[in-house]
């Protein structure tokens, strides 16, 4: 336990700071805009995030594998690769928007400028995955944690400042756009400094050939899993209303600290498995993860309603039940988060992909019925049931 804390303290501190900033940001945005506008933001972010992350999510793993597979320098090629993927994703978002220009679901008849700017700046933010992969390979968790913290502090600051000046959805997306531009610039500079000029460089074509097989594996795995992750708010907005989307989104946001723990432990876990294929997961689960899970259950069950009122206000009090339902699913994933990393580094990622297909299938089958009958509680139930089915299969 002591060695675990020593090895993960920078990551845990970083993600702890990020979680606190995220919760405070939720309070500022949700209380300022109310459930309907907060739900609408979730719908916009869900569609945009899906289009980008379906090509970019976990590409840090691709960079990690490539670092082990070649002695040549490839950072410049990796940056170009991510920018091209960003352009493809950007085109996909615009295509979706233009396909439904007069659809009331988006609550606009023509695409606002703030969304165009946010989508455009998101292209460059893709290179963050290159940075994560390089530092995970080097085991430099201190710099990794510092940059993650810096990124979230910048985002928090821009959101707070612009929302305080003008309480609107427009201000929120302008803040996110400014954050993406500034952080992308910083990441770009840091990546250039990490280039080893003593090594021979790999061309973009050769980098693509090196990446192709593992890229397809990661994309299949991530693409399937991202649909319930990012479209849940969109689906509740479609089958119910923006108010229900807002209530559910608050429930999900307040459960997000569990994801921050997973993010904190993941680079460390990847590094450990990379060094020792026989790492003792049983000891990790029962001595570290399980006590954390019990503490979270006690907190959310006994103090969850107060937590919601403190963070989002009384108008979001309906978020308590969906929050508890989501807690069950999220903790199921937390206790077994290491399975994905073990399967990935042992060339068994296909099993995780099958697990995600099961997750997606269960989610798509159950969510329309459960939402129709139970509203925001129904979408939370669909998400948790899907996660549990996935984890049962992977075990």
Predicted feature residues:
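Helix-loop junctions and terminal segments of transmembrane helices
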Residues: 53-71, 136-137, 255-278, 342-345
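Small-residue hotspots at the loop-to-helix junctions and early N-terminal turns
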Residues: 38-42, 46, 115, 242-253, ...
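Membrane-water interface segments that mark the loop-to-transmembrane alpha-helix transition
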Residues: 6-18, 44, 49, 53-100, ...
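Transmembrane helical elements of multi-pass membrane transporters/channels
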Residues: 7-22, 148-151, 155, 172-192, ...
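Alpha-helical transmembrane segments of multi-pass membrane transporters/permeases
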Residues: 7-18, 72-76, 115-120, 135-160, ...
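Interfacial segments at transmembrane-helix termini and the short loops linking adjacent helices
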Residues: 100-118, 302-334
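Hydrophobic alpha-helical transmembrane segments
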Residues: 43, 112, 116-119, 145-195, ...
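Signature of the first transmembrane helix
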Residues: 3-57, 90, 94, 156, ...
């Amino acid at each position: 336990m002591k060695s675990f804390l020593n090895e993960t303290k920078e990551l845990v501190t970083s993600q702890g700071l990020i979680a606190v900033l995220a919760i405070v940001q939720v309070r500022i945005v949700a209380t300022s805009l109310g459930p309907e506008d907060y739900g609408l933001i979730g719908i916009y972010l869900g569609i945009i995030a899906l289009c980008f992350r379906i090509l970019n999510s976990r590409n840090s793993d691709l960079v990690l594998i490539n670092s082990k597979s070649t002695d040549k320098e490839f950072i410049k090629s990796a940056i170009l690769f991510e920018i091209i993927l960003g352009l493809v994703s950007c085109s996909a978002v615009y295509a979706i928007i233009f396909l439904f220009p007069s659809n009331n679901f988006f609550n606009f008849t023509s695409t606002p400028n703030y969304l165009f700017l946010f989508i455009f700046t998101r292209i460059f933010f893709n290179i963050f995955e290159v940075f994560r992969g390089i530092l995970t390979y080097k085991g430099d968790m201190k710099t990794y944690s510092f940059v993650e913290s810096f990124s979230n502090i910048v985002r928090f600051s821009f959101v707070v400042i612009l929302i305080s000046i003008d309480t609107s959805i427009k201000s929120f997306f302008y803040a996110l756009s400014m954050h993406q531009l500034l952080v992308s610039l910083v990441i770009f500079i840091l990546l250039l400094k990490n280039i080893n000029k003593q090594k021979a460089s790999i061309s973009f074509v050769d980098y693509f050939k090196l990446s192709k097989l593992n890229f397809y594996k990661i994309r299949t795995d991530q693409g399937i899993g991202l649909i319930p992750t990012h479209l849940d708010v969109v689906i509740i907005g479609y089958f119910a209303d923006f108010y229900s989307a807002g209530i559910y989104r608050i429930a999900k946001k307040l459960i997000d600290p569990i994801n921050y723990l997973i993010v904190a432990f993941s680079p460390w876990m990847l590094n450990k498995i990379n060094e020792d294929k026989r790492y003792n997961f049983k000891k990790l689960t029962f001595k570290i993860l399980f006590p954390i899970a019990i503490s979270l259950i006690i907190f959310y069950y006994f103090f969850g309603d107060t937590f919601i009122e403190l963070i989002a206000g009384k108008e979001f009090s309906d978020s308590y039940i969906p929050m508890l339902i989501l807690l069950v699913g999220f903790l199921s994933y937390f206790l077994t988060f290491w399975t994905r990393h073990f399967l990935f580094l042992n060339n068994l990622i296909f099993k995780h992909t099958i697990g995600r297909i099961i997750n997606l299938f269960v989610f798509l089958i159950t969510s329309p019925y459960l939402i129709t009958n139970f509203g925001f509680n129904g979408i939370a139930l669909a998400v948790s049931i899907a996660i549990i089915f996935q984890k049962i299969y992977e075990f």
